[in-house]
Every structure is written in C-alpha cells, then in structure tokens.
C-alpha cells in the first residue's frame, strides 16, 4: 500500500529521513503515528526508527540530545522541531514483566517491528509513502481488530502493561480484540500486580477519556484485570454499574469526572485513600473528591451557597453534568444563580483578618479566634453578614457576649 500524500506533520520530518538515507542508512516513520494516518485520525507523535546506531545518528545531525541513548533513542533538533530517532533493536528476556534485561541494536527493520505490541502498531512508512507491513497490520486495521504481534502469550508475558494498553486501544480506536489475543490478556492479567500503579493509572485514565470507553471497560472487566489493581478486587458488578444510564455516545468531560464516577459506582466513602492507592497527585485527589461530594449532596438537595463556595463552580458543573448524563434531574440555573450571588469567593476577600482582630479587639491568637473567623466567613457566604468592617466587628462582639 502506498499513500499518495503524507500529512503535514510527516512532510515536515521528511528532511530527517532523507539525511539519514543519504548517510547510507535506512529510516522510517513508525508506531502510532503511522496507524493514525491510515485511520485518518489526528497525529500526536512522529516517531522515526533507523538502522543507524546512536553514535552514527549523532554524527549525521549537528544538534542532538541523548534522551535515552542506552535504548537507542536520540533527540534530533532540526527545522525548529524535535524528533525522537530510535535505532532498530531487539530485546532480550524481560525483567519485572515490564523492562527488557538487555537491548541489542540491529540493522533489520523487521527485527525491530516484531518486538511491538499489536500488529496495527507494527507498521512502518518510508519517505515515498510506501507502507511496510510485516505482520498483517493493514488487514487488522481494515477489520478493526487488535491482534498481538507474533505469539500473544509471549507479548504479555514480556510486558504486562500491554494488557492495559490493549483495553485502552480498544476504547480509543473502537476495535475488537482478536480472540487469541484476548485469551492471552485474561491468562496474564495477574501480572498487572507486577506493574507500577502509576503506569496502570495512566492507561486506565486514557481508557476512561476515550470515545468508546465502555468497550474498553467491558474488556477490562471480562478479563478480570480489576482483581489486580488497587481497590477494585471482586468489584465486577460495581464496575459494570459504572456504565449504567449513559447513552452510547457519552464521553467524560475530564479525568476527574471519570474517576469520580467510578468512586460513586463503587460506593466508596474513603475517596482520598482510594485515589492515594493509585498514587495520584494531591491536587487530583482534591478535585475528584469535590465532584463526588457535590454529587452526593445533590442526591438529597440543591447545592447551597456554602457548597458552591467551598467546592467551586467547576466541580459543581462536572457533578451536575454527570447527573445529566445519567438522566437524573438537574438545575443548572439555580446553581449558577447561587454561585453568582456569592459576595465572596475566597476567605482572603474578607475585609478583616486575624491580625486585624487581634490588634483592634485585643484578641489573642488561638482556637477561639479561629472559630470566630470561621463563623464570620460562613455568615458572609450565606448572606447574613455584610463584608464590612463595622458589621463584622459588631458580629464578633455579639458572639463574644454569647459565649
């Protein structure tokens, strides 16, 4: 198969391939970028593989950076762009079900392509637009089928993360997973215990954000991969429930919303502990927890001024959008009116602070002062106290009299 025209991203990189060829080596576009051209999808990466060894690659170009030279990768800076150029390689026995014990550089494109995960990712493209297909990847693209390169058992035994990648590709490409490949994924799902949680999180997160996330999640559940990931053991029915009520074309607004949906489906009450077990950032944990909290509050009442002040408009919209997607009653107008009616959006907008009260009212730092400031903040947010110095002083004096 030959492409009549290369996309602009690849055309811009053609001088790189030509320079390598002029130096006497082979060079091809490889990986997901080639697959995405053939599927008429947006191109995110332009990866180049070559028969030149790293030192030979560096000799061809004037500006290079060693970013992974032990694995054969050199970053080339050319034409105001950066390109990762990797030497054809083979890999020895894998350790930890993730990393090869040794990488050997080779001159053969086929040897390089045979170490790839799936046939649709094992395609190469030369500078003329000719597609090199050593493992029937074009046929699988046409069939919309995900198939492991070579023996599926070996591919997942080598690198168990490929199992999660398979679910993710099914979701992002809307591809069926070929039967033998899927059986091997099921058989080796237990190896996911050996993979770093951070890497599994990245793949599951990409799955959730894919257009056909339900398909990917269905494969994930059928393979029982959930049993080997944090907080999901024996939660098949709840995970299946994650897909309930959404129409076929629903996609999540954000990763935070997607993970909030999972927590809600799992009926977890220790959201942060669950998210921490996935080694997510504190900021991510906070945002997901806000969405979950607001979603649960909405099960019994409309959101109050204090709810919107504490958790913010963005989390409230994501929560309400989740309700809408599930066919539950929503009230965006009330929510936005309530938010717009807030007199402050942050405690730093209050016209007095602890230092002022200590000086003006001769108060001492401590729990009493902190408690009073919380009362002031709450009263201002709820609209029962004006954010004015005199009003706040009078409010505090009255509170002190009542204590």
Swiss-Prot record:
Signal peptide: none annotated. The keyword tRNA processing applies. It catalyses: a tRNA precursor + 2 CTP + ATP = a tRNA with a 3' CCA end + 3 diphosphate; a tRNA with a 3' CCA end + 2 CTP + ATP = a tRNA with a 3' CCACCA end + 3 diphosphate. InterPro entries: Bact_CCA-adding_enz_type3_sf, CCA-adding_enz_C, CCA-adding_enz_firmicutes, NT_sf, PolA_pol_head_dom, PolyA_RNA-bd. Mg(2+) binds at residues 45, 47. Its cofactor is Mg(2+). ATP binds at residues 32, 35, 116, 159, 162, 165, 168. This is CCA-adding enzyme.
């Amino acid at each position: 198969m030959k492409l009549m025209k290369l996309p602009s991203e690849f055309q811009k990189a053609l001088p790189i391939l030509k320079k390598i060829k002029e130096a006497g080596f082979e060079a091809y576009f490889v990986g997901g970028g080639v697959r995405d051209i053939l599927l008429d999808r947006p191109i995110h990466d332009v990866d180049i593989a070559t028969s030149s060894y790293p030192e030979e690659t560096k000799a061809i170009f004037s500006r290079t950076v060693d970013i992974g030279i032990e694995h054969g990768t050199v970053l080339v800076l050319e034409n105001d762009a950066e390109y990762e150029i990797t030497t054809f390689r083979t890999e020895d026995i894998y350790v930890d079900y993730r990393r090869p014990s040794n990488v050997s550089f080779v001159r053969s494109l086929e040897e390089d392509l045979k170490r790839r995960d799936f046939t649709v990712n094992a395609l190469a493209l030369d500078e003329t637009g000719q597609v090199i297909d050593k493992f029937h990847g074009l046929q699988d693209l046409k069939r919309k089928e995900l198939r492991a390169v070579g023996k599926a058992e070996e591919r997942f035994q080598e690198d168990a993360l490929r199992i999660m990648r398979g679910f993710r590709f099914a979701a992002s490409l809307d591809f069926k997973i070929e039967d033998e490949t899927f059986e091997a994924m099921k058989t080796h799902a237990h190896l996911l215990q050996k993979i770093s949680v951070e890497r599994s999180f990245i793949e599951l997160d990409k799955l959730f954000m894919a257009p056909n996330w339900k398909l990917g999640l269905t494969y994930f559940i059928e393979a029982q991969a959930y049993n080997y990931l944090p907080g999901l053991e024996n939660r098949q029915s709840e995970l299946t429930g994650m897909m309930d009520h959404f129409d076929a074309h629903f996609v999540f607004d954000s990763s935070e919303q997607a993970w909030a949906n999972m927590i809600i489906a799992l009926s977890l009450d220790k959201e942060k502990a669950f998210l921490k077990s996935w080694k997510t950032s504190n900021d991510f944990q906070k945002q997901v927890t806000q969405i979950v909290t607001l979603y649960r509050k909405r099960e019994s009442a409309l959101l109050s001024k204090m709810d919107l002040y504490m958790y913010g408009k963005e989390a409230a919209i994501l929560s309400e959008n989740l309700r809408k997607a599930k066919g539950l009653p929503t009230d965006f107008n009330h929510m936005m009116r309530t938010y717009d009616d807030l007199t402050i959006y942050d405690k730093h907008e209050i016209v007095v602070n602890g230092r002022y009260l200590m000086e003006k009212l001769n108060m001492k730092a401590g729990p009493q002062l902190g408690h009073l400031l919380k009362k002031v903040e709450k009263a201002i947010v709820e609209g029962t106290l004006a954010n004015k110095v005199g009003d706040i002083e009078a409010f505090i004096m009255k509170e002190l009299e009542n204590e």
